[in-house]
Amino acid sequence: MKSGKQSSQPEKGTSRILSLTVLFIAFCGFSFYLGGIFCSERDKIVAKDVTRTTTKAVASPKEPTATPIQIKSVSFPECGSEFQDYTPCTDPKRWKKYGVHRLSFLERHCPPVYEKNECLIPPPDGYKPPIRWPKSREQCWYRNVPYDWINKQKSNQHWLKKEGDKFHFPGGGTMFPRGVSHYVDLMQDLIPEMKDGTVRTAIDTGCGVASWGGDLLDRGILSLSLAPRDNHEAQVQFALERGIPAILGIISTQRLPFPSNAFDMAHCSRCLIPWTEFGGIYLLEIHRIVRPGGFWVLSGPPVNYNRRWRGWNTTMEDQKSDYNKLQSLLTSMCFKKYAQKDDIAVWQKLSDKSCYDKIAKNMEAYPPKCDDSIEPDSAWYTPLRPCVVAPTPKVKKSGLGSIPKWPERLHVAPERIGDVHGGSANSLKHDDGKWKNRVKHYKKVLPALGTDKIRNVMDMNTVYGGFSAALIEDPIWVMNVVSSYSANSLPVVFDRGLIGTYHDWCEAFSTYPRTYDLLHLDSLFTLESHRCEMKYILLEMDRILRPSGYVIIRESSYFMDAITTLAKGIRWSCRREETEYAVKSEKILVCQKKLWFSSNQTS
């Protein structure tokens, strides 16, 4: 009996082990099967996101018609007057929560969902519709940007001058006492590429009131002005009120929201950025976003130190040391001194890979070459890296001098389009043709488009910048926004000679209230509604839209009723229009924001 019971135990144990083994193998196989499905579907989603703008909007008879989503009517209250310049992700009231190291408190710090405001931001008392372009470049209404501090503190530098109910912009600046046009003339003498269409895109760090960027527009150069939110100067708000491209931002601990090799030129006119501190990490970010062959221009300390040091409250020895340190850092990053005259110095980012190969071979080199695990285009809440981003070997024609000159480059498929899933020269050509037809139709349903009533425009979810390209002859500029969650097509936008930024529409955009005349979106809610609540996107749109400004929403019919209901609660007046192909599955909603004043103010 004992021997029989003992002999039966191994048999049961073996059976149980075999059963578990079979189950485990089956589970693994099923997991691989599900993983294959997931990866396949994920690729389809990415492909759909890119190719949605490269195919005609023709309804498929096989697609089931979903019942449009419905929501209850809602009426959003007014925010208090203290919110009139509210920037949710760069809110001075939240600065004390964050560290002062490298001024990181000035970076984006967005409130959690439970702290988001669900109210409408009022304009300042006495707000008027902005002066139209191009007069707006020279003057704006004081009540629209009521900042006296900058007028008083910078009066001797002629940044701006208050006269009656207007601010006037005489084109002065810290480093251009003879006017910005004279300053840019000197710069063009040093950089002939600014005259022939070679240089098209630029970034101005620490932009003042954006007079440099404003002057470049007449020279065929599109500059994006960059400055942090502050309590006094409101540099970006002044720039956008003037109709000059600008965005809130600071080089601190995170990368700027642009891809690598984006700008043809970067500029700093006494922008007070400590370029040689922290191992030159700020210069490394400039190196990342400037394309090979592009330029970095510096005017102000320590340039021309032997003549200027007395006015800088320093010693000539200190400034000489700073200059030598700056030159050494730039050389170690594969910049070469290009030209210098008086207060302006120019360095050029090398295109020759031998410099980067030399860094890679020298194990003791500082800064080192970034390894392959660091994605050069990753730029949404991505920490700054203390290393040199070398040009990608497979991309050989993205450098300045290799890409076509402006305006030819707008319609030539850049080499980096091959990095976008489904991207090709044919897809870009098709996209351009499609957007020409769409914009032609938009101008029928919104006659103000193409006139001086609209200056600052945002394409909230572009792919190749086709909407912007179709408007290139009109008196507007376009901020092209590429979702941080979609395929990385922003390098293509920059290679075409346009400007833009990465962004996640679950968060607030990096700008002041009342800064855009037109917001355009194409299928944004279809693509993002699973992540972002619709009402918060629309409230953010209302925040950045100017009173009397317009919205063009091109969206699936499934969302149209809900969008219309929310828009009514935001005090927009809207009308529904057919698309250019009059398909049932897609509609256009054209809205206008009303000019209203807080009940606590007088109009």
UniProtKB/Swiss-Prot annotation:
<dbReference type="InterPro" id="IPR004159">
    <property type="entry name" value="Put_SAM_MeTrfase"/>
</dbReference>
<feature type="topological domain" description="Cytoplasmic">
    <location>
        <begin position="1"/>
        <end position="16"/>
    </location>
</feature>
<dbReference type="GO" id="GO:0000139">
    <property type="term" value="C:Golgi membrane"/>
</dbReference>
<dbReference type="GO" id="GO:0032259">
    <property type="term" value="P:methylation"/>
</dbReference>
<keyword id="KW-0325">Glycoprotein</keyword>
<feature type="glycosylation site" description="N-linked (GlcNAc...) asparagine">
    <location>
        <position position="313"/>
    </location>
</feature>
<dbReference type="GO" id="GO:0005802">
    <property type="term" value="C:trans-Golgi network"/>
</dbReference>
<protein>
    <recommendedName>
        <fullName>Probable methyltransferase PMT20</fullName>
        <ecNumber>2.1.1.-</ecNumber>
    </recommendedName>
</protein>
<keyword id="KW-0735">Signal-anchor</keyword>
<keyword id="KW-0333">Golgi apparatus</keyword>
<keyword id="KW-1133">Transmembrane helix</keyword>
<feature type="glycosylation site" description="N-linked (GlcNAc...) asparagine">
    <location>
        <position position="600"/>
    </location>
</feature>
<dbReference type="GO" id="GO:0005768">
    <property type="term" value="C:endosome"/>
</dbReference>
<keyword id="KW-0489">Methyltransferase</keyword>
<dbReference type="GO" id="GO:0005797">
    <property type="term" value="C:Golgi medial cisterna"/>
</dbReference>
<comment type="similarity">
    <text>Belongs to the methyltransferase superfamily.</text>
</comment>
<keyword id="KW-0472">Membrane</keyword>
<feature type="topological domain" description="Lumenal">
    <location>
        <begin position="38"/>
        <end position="603"/>
    </location>
</feature>
<dbReference type="GO" id="GO:0005794">
    <property type="term" value="C:Golgi apparatus"/>
</dbReference>
<dbReference type="InterPro" id="IPR029063">
    <property type="entry name" value="SAM-dependent_MTases_sf"/>
</dbReference>
<dbReference type="Pfam" id="PF03141">
    <property type="entry name" value="Methyltransf_29"/>
</dbReference>
<feature type="transmembrane region" description="Helical; Signal-anchor for type II membrane protein">
    <location>
        <begin position="17"/>
        <end position="37"/>
    </location>
</feature>
<keyword id="KW-0812">Transmembrane</keyword>
<keyword id="KW-0808">Transferase</keyword>
<dbReference type="GO" id="GO:0008168">
    <property type="term" value="F:methyltransferase activity"/>
</dbReference>
